A protein has these predicted regions:
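Beta/alpha (TIM)-barrel catalytic core signal, keyed to glycine-rich beta->alpha loops juxtaposed to Asp/Glu
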Residues: 2-169, 174, 178
């Protein structure tokens, strides 16, 4: 049994109630977690470690932003957030959460790290997502079959300390790029 988009309080409270009532408890949590959205690490990661709950992160590519396709202000035809920006309203608000000056700046820096490490940004972002002790598996998505090789390449990648340190430096300098 799992939950999605839950808070630390909600997760720990539900576990306490399940234990009190003698019913099945949450074993997994599915939340957004990527190089551009590391809020899970603020509190939920520690709660998951203490309670034995595994994260199954979704959107490890930040809605496609971490593919680099929006770099330089590009709005690729047919891309989800390009379409959302055209629609306006609520969709545009969501798009701006993912595609903004800070997320694009961090994405470009992560891309440079990936290049120095000899891999694509997609592979770096996916490998980073799976390389946490609280992660059970990562939910990946692709709109085209040709996107899969870079994603699958991450299965065989373990990021070294120097790469992780470089990633963490970017995350410290550009805090919470998705707000």
């Amino acid at each position: 049994i799992g939950c999605s988009n839950e808070t630390t309080w909600g997760l720990t409270k539900s576990i306490a109630v399940a234990e009190r009532e003698g019913v099945a408890r949450y074993e997994t949590i599915q939340n957004n977690f990527s190089l551009n959205n590391r809020r899970f690490e603020d509190e939920l990661a520690q709660a998951c470690r203490q309670e034995g709950v595994s994260l199954i992160p979704y959107s490890p590519l930040g809605g496609g932003v971490l593919s680099g396709k929006y770099n330089g202000g590009a709005t690729p035809d047919g891309a989800r957030f390009s379409n959302y920006l055209k629609l306006g309203g609520r969709q545009a608000v969501m798009a701006r959460r993912f595609v903004n000056e800070r997320s694009l700046a961090s994405t470009e820096r992560f891309g440079a790290i990936a290049g120095e490490a000899g891999m694509s940004l997609v592979t770096l972002a996916t490998a980073w997502s799976k390389q946490h002790d609280f992660v059970a598996s990562t939910i990946v998505g692709a709109t085209h079959e040709d996107q899969l090789p870079e994603i699958f390449a991450a299965a065989d990648v373990t990021l070294g300390k120097d790469v992780l340190d470089a990633i963490n430096k970017v995350s410290q300098e550009i805090r919470y790029p998705m707000g």
